[in-house]
């Protein structure tokens, strides 16, 4: 819950964090050397997800940090609906020692606007 509070209050923080274009993120989905992490909530995932992205809702991220790469230098891309939450989570993960975290500009709302393939999330 602490992580959620920190992220909520810093969600409008500076966007000076490392960011990546939607096109680049799309090209990296499925690349085994990059984790592309969709941090939207389950009700947002229900609208469609991109195949190959790991789904960890922001509300559960703190309890699921063990699912992130063990190497803190591994590349992690974060995507949410627009980029507000993903930029805040990137900042928080960097403060926890992850050195190669970027957020995706535009988010999944822009992904959908471009008509890129989305599918129903896997059943838990």
Task: Go through each PLM region and give its residues.
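Hydrophobic helical h-region of N-terminal Sec-dependent signal peptides
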Residues: 8-9, 13
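Metallo-beta-lactamase
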Residues: 78-80
